């Protein structure tokens, strides 16, 4: 019996635990969590030149950053922000420096003569004494520095149909010798074609444009955010950056395009650091600003460019030579380059990815091998719309102090046909503009590949222009805020949930929304009452900022790709917010910050640590469960709506006014009419059946005729009976006048039939009740016995529990009494001992005095 009772108690306790310890899915809206995004960004700039303002929005410098106590993965090469920067700078570059279409007709044979045999790219061995230039060197101003010869050019003539289409006309044009392909005849006159004639297909007209260095920043669309790794040890790839800040916009970035070096960058600091690709040897090295590294480029000369008309609508630019330096240019480098390059080597040795020699004497700067594209072999840069190709051989000799001619300047030449740096192909540009061209830049970075072999390390300059923008923006990443989260709680929908404390949140737009990203889940959930409003306020704020700059910039109406992308960012966040609200509505949680549900949390192995885990960490663990949880919530909401509909139908009669609503009654009136019609039809069928059965037995129908019917009705003979003397003829009239009319009797008959019908129905119902009552009585008796058994069991269980509680109470009382007595006894003993010790100490002087007295006696 005792074991049985113990088993019952255990079952009850287990059931109670299952009921009260169950975990239910709770929907939180407004959590500080995010995921990687690839939505297009929009740009903002302070430049006011024509193409800059068309391509980007005006910059208002109203941007903030807040630190987040989280860790996040960053990769400068696998990055949406840097990929967009590369693509967008290419589009800006193509927009500002347009390829020219007027050269397409020159895919014809030309007769060319060389006009100069000197080359600026001279590789002949000269003096090994370094020739170093500075701002005061005289050859800079008069263009007389050594090793700077004239460019090799060819003067070509070709025939084309001009204004008169039936008569060919001869034209003249001067080319840089490397822009044409000629035969190998030994004579002074050669047959030549334009280089890349068959691959350069251009379909738009162009004018001569140029661009200066332009800076712009990227801004996240409303509802999204930019994260930045603020760790000084970040080197382009970091799985767990410990210092993360949130921002709405990036810093300003430079749009200079060049190979080998990066110019005027915004990431240069008073130190040297290296961004290293996570999987190969590609690097971008940021140079120390302390060494003040600069590059000054110059194209001397004063050359006129005169247009000639080939035919109507086609104008070609002729280039008659005025001086002896056509297309000639050169660049000299200022600053302490040798110390800067030595610091680069020392920084490379300390880099965690470096596995080569630690001896900086065996680390050398090298240029790419011959045979590559000109943009790889030479340092390629853009100077006011002109493309310079500079031979850096003697400059590298000077840096590495090699036993070869050393110069801190490099001869350059200008080309019209260049290889595109972002896509495969060639572009043809207009001839150099007239007059002298001067460009001054600050060298801020080096694009290089690190090659380690045979205890030697080569820092090979690279032509990966895109690496410049990975250095500029590689510490950023774009994330999409995911404000909806799921977590298990013990609260069930419609249960009495405890009141949540509200905590004020400072308003920083979307950045304020992420302010608690590093807090524990329990602390962050306390601010959810303010987060959705803050989230929406941040979206509205960003939308308003974007709308304001669009209104300030009327040139936006003329945009193509960039403008469309900028305008599309205005609807991105609204769509996301409405999509989130639609999801919440499908779960029955619309416009709620914390929404309890009736869906059980089935993954008991995945439980959040509310005191130590952030929402971002929790979301990463439960992201795979989101689809199943969402589907379960939708099914629960559908069932809840069905239940509510049925309950509303039952509760509609609780309102007294609904009883007078005809629409509520008409349905039941229809049911009543159907019942009456059914009873009447059934009665008619029964009567017809009975009538047919009587006819078969020989009875005459009751309603065969009125006279027959009257004959079957009892007639009172004492009413106006005729005299016996009357004749037979008068009998009929006397009968008709002295009898009851047959319709009245028929009504009496119907009344009797109706009474009989009702009596029959009453008998049937009474019989049905009499037969059902014993069955119901048995059911009620069984139910009564079951309730009695449950009552007795509950009484017994309660008695056991009371007995157990009384026993436990007695044990506790005995324990308390024993403890109290023990402590009291111990205290008395301790107090007595302390008293004896104290009296002994107080008696010491008396004992001393007594001893002294005895000694004196």
Curated annotation (Swiss-Prot):
Region (V1): 112-155
Motif mapping: YXXV motif: 699-702
Location of the region described as MPER in the Swiss-Prot/TrEMBL record: 649-670
Cleavage, annotated site positions: 503-504
Fusion peptide: region residues: 504-524
GO molecular function, one term: structural molecule activity
Region called V3, residue ranges: 297-330
Disulfide bridge partners, by residue number: 43-56, 100-206, 107-197, 112-156, 219-249, 229-241, 297-331, 383-439, 390-412
Lipid moiety-binding region (S-palmitoyl cysteine): 765
Region spans: Immunosuppression: 567-583
Residues bearing attached sugar chains per UniProt: 36, 69, 78, 113, 121, 134, 142, 159, 186, 198, 230, 233, 264, 270, 281, 292, 302, 358, 364, 391, 440, 455, 603, 612, 628
CDD domains per record: HIV-1-like_HR1-HR2
InterPro entries for the chain: Gp120_core_sf, GP41-like, HIV1_Gp120
GO cellular component, one term: host cell plasma membrane
Function: The surface protein gp120 (SU) attaches the virus to the host lymphoid cell by binding to the primary receptor CD4. This interaction induces a structural rearrangement creating a high affinity binding site for a chemokine coreceptor like CXCR4 and/or CCR5. This peculiar 2 stage receptor-interaction strategy allows gp120 to maintain the highly conserved coreceptor-binding site in a cryptic conformation, protected from neutralizing antibodies. Since CD4 also displays a binding site for the disulfide-isomerase P4HB/PDI, a P4HB/PDI-CD4-CXCR4-gp120 complex may form.
Name the record gives this protein: Envelope glycoprotein gp160
Organism encoding this protein: Human immunodeficiency virus type 2 subtype A (isolate KR)
Name of the encoding gene: env
């Amino acid at each position: 019996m005792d074991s049985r009772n113990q088993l019952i108690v255990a079952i009850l306790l287990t059931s109670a635990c299952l009921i009260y310890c169950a975990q239910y899915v709770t929907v939180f809206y407004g959590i500080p969590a995010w995921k990687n995004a690839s939505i297009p960004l929009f740009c903002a700039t302070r430049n006011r030149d024509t193409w800059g303002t068309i391509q980007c929005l005006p910059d208002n410098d109203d941007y903030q950053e807040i630190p987040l106590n989280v860790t996040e993965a960053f990769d400068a090469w696998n990055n949406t922000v840097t990929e967009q920067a590369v693509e967008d700078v290419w589009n800006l570059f193509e927009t500002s420096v347009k390829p020219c279409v007027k050269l397409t007709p020159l895919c014809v044979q030309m007769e060319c003569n060389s006009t100069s045999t000197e080359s600026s790219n001279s590789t002949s061995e000269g003096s090994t004494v370094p020739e170093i230039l500075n701002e005061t060197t005289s050859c800079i101003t008069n263009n007389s520095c050594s090793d700077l010869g004239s460019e090799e050019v060819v003067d070509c003539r070709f025939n084309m149909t001009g204004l008169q289409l039936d008569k060919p006309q001869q034209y003249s044009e001067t080319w840089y010798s490397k822009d044409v392909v000629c035969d190998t005849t030994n004579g002074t006159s050669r047959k030549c074609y334009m280089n890349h004639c068959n691959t350069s297909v251009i379909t738009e007209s162009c004018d001569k444009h140029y661009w200066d260095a332009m800076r712009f920043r990227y801004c996240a669309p409303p509802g999204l955010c930019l994260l930045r790794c603020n760790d000084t040890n970040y080197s382009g790839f970091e799985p767990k950056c410990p210092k993360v800040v949130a921002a709405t916009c990036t810093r300003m970035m430079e749009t200079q395009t060049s190979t080998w070096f990066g110019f005027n960058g915004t990431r240069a600091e008073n130190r040297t650091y290296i961004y290293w690709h996570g999987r190969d040897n590609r690097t971008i090295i940021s140079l120390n600003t302390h060494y003040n590294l600069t590059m000054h480029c110059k194209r001397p000369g004063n050359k006129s460019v005169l247009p000639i008309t080939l035919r109507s609508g086609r104008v070609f630019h002729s280039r008659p030579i005025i001086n002896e330096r056509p297309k000639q240019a050169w660049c000299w480098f200022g600053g302490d380059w040798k110390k800067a390059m030595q610091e680069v080597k020392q920084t490379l040795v300390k880099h965690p990815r470096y596995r080569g020699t630690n001896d900086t004497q065996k680390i050398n700067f090298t240029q790419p091998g011959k045979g590559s594209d000109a943009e790889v072999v030479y340092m390629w840069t853009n100077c006011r719309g002109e493309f310079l190709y500079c031979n850096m051989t003697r400059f590298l000799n000077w840096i590495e102090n090699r036993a070869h001619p050393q110069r801190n300047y490099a001869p350059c030449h200008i080309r019209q046909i260049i290889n595109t740096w972002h896509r495969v192909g060639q572009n043809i540009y207009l001839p150099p503009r007239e007059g002298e061209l001067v460009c001054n830049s600050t060298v801020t970075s080096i694009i290089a590949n690190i090659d380690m072999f045979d205890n030697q390390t080569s820092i090979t300059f690279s032509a990966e222009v895109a690496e410049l923008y990975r250095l500029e923006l590689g510490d950023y990443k774009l994330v999409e805020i995911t404000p909806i989260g799921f977590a298990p709680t013990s609260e069930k929908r419609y249960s009495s949930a405890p009141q949540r404390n509200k905590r004020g949140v400072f308003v920083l737009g979307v950045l304020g929304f992420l302010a608690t990203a590093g807090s524990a889940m329990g602390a962050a959930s306390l601010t959810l009452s303010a987060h959705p409003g803050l989230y929406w306020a941040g979206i509205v704020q960003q939308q308003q900022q974007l709308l304001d700059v669009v209104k300030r910039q009327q040139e936006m109406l003329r945009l193509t790709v960039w403008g469309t992308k900028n305008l599309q960012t205005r609807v991105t966040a609204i769509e996301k917010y409405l999509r989130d609200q639609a999801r919440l509505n499908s779960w029955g949680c619309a416009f709620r910050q914390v929404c309890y549900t009736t869906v059980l949390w089935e993954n008991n192995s995945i439980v959040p640590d509310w005191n130590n885990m952030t929402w971002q960490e929790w979301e990463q663990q439960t992201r795979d469960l989101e689809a199943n949880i969402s589907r379960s919530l939708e099914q629960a909401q559908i069932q809840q709506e069905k239940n509510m509909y049925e309950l509303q139908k039952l509760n509609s009669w609780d309102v007294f006014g609904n009883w007078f609503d005809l629409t509520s009654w008409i349905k039941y009136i229809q049911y009543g009419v159907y019942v009456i019609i059914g009873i009447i039809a059934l009665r008619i069928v029964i009567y017809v059946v009975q009538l047919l059965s009587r006819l078969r037995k020989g009875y005459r129908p009751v309603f065969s005729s009125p006279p027959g019917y009257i004959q079957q009705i009892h007639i009172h003979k004492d009413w106006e009976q005729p005299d016996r003397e009357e004749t037979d003829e008068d009998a009929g009239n006397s009968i008709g006048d002295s009898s009851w009319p047959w319709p009245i009797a028929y009504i009496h008959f119907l009344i009797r039939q109706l009474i009989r019908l009702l009596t029959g129905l009453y008998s049937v119902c009474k019989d049905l009740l009499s037969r059902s009552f014993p069955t119901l009585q048995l059911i009620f008796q069984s139910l009564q016995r079951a309730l009695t058994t449950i009552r007795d069991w509950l009484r017994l269980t309660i008695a056991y529990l009371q007995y157990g509680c009384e026993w436990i109470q007695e044990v506790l009382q005995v324990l308390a009494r024993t403890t109290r007595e023990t402590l009291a006894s111990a205290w008395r003993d301790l107090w007595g001992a302390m008293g004896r010790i104290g009296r002994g100490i107080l008696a010491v002087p008396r004992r001393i005095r007594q001893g002294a007295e005895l000694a004196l006696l």
